[in-house]
Amino acid sequence: MNGMASDRIAVMQATPGDLVAVLALDDRPDRATEVSEAVVSGRCSVARVDDEIVGFGVRGTFFGHDFLELLVVAEHRRRQGVGAALVEAFVSGAGPAKVFTSTNASNAPMRALCERLGFVEAGTIDHLDEANPEVVYVRLVPAAPGALP
């Protein structure tokens, strides 16, 4: 099915039973151990459309703040709201103040998604991938109404 997925996306915590489908989405087999550990430890969320896992995100921390370490969306579901749903679910479950993510400077789709969802550039990290700096993004999360400072 090639229709728009945005109204049928369900985001939930990944379970060990999701692991095969999650790993099949990632085109980088060198990350299999890291992704497997994220699933088992409860740091991975999956996006489902019509009961098919079509994306996942891995949560971590960055200098004590919530950090979206990895976002992967099935190629046939890109630009249909799956990535945005995963990011928004991450932000809504994150701690107060701010959340971070990063991507290579060459990853124009992810950079556009970050900017569309209210993230701003916080800086760059050189020399992780030669000639392709890592761009770090931050999104300030407003405090819940009635929350104490």
Regions found by a protein language model. Give the residues of each.
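Acetyl-CoA-dependent GNAT
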Residues: I9, Q13-L70, A74-H76, V87-E88, ...
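Conserved N-terminal glycine/acidic-rich loop preference
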Residues: A108-D126
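Conserved N-terminal entry element of GNAT/NAT acetyltransferase domains
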Residues: M1-G17, R139-P149
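Conserved catalytic-core motifs of GNAT/GCN5-like acyltransferases
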Residues: F100-S102, V120-V136
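Conserved GNAT acetyl-CoA-binding A-motif
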Residues: G93-A105
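Short beta-strand element of the conserved SAM-dependent methyltransferase core
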Residues: S45-R48, V135-L140
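Conserved acetyl-CoA-binding loop-helix of GNAT-fold acetyltransferases
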Residues: V73, R79-S92, A112-R116
